[in-house]
Amino acid sequence: VTGKEAWKMRIIALVPAVLAAAVLLVSTTASAAPGNIGFGFNARDISGFPTGAASLTGGGSYNPVTGFVKSAGGFRCTSDVGQGPLAGCLSGEGVRWDTVELRRSTTFKCTGSAAEPLKTATTDENTVVLLADFYRAGDGNDESFTAQMIVSADDIAPDIAGIQNVWIQGVGCASAIANFSS
């Protein structure tokens, strides 16, 4: 066996070991990182702050471990909003929203009242906290407003009567039809 042939035999002998190690590494990484979580929701009459109300619908997918998010939907102000990030959104305005980023958590209030305790929502397999851009028809592809929002399969404000599982910053909370799957 010449030097060249011996070298080829060593490479051929190592190929199965390298492939086995690669498969093991990929499968370990895949099992350690959970997959994306899908969600969809429909919320009407989001309100609670002194002025304003909105409807919000949409969905997408996110991964709380990696920070991946891709989600969007429709929105409309159903009553003039006079405070917070959506201040100036008039009744009947609003077309769509899309995601700026996935947030690990946020603090929020459903009513904006000083007496209401501050609550915290955390992104997990049943709750998604987003920073989103909201668009009005006349503004084209330039976002009209940027605000945080929460969608959850669970009640995010058990201190308030009824189920509150969606929130828009500066507008309030509402009960939504919400589904999450992983």
Regions found by a protein language model. Name each.
Residues V1, V26-A33:
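Basic/polar N-terminal segments that are highly enriched at the extreme N-terminus
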Residues V1-K8:
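Short, Lys/Arg-enriched N-terminal segments with co-localized hydrophobic residues
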Residues I11-A13:
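Mobile, glycine-rich extracellular loop/lid and propeptide segments
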Residues V15-V26:
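Bacterial N-terminal signal peptides
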Residues A30-R96, E101, I163-S182:
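N-terminal segment immediately downstream of the Sec signal-peptide cleavage site
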Residues V81-Y135:
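An exposed acidic His-Trp-rich patch
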Residues S113-G172:
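Extracytosolic low-complexity repeat regions of secreted or lipid-anchored proteins
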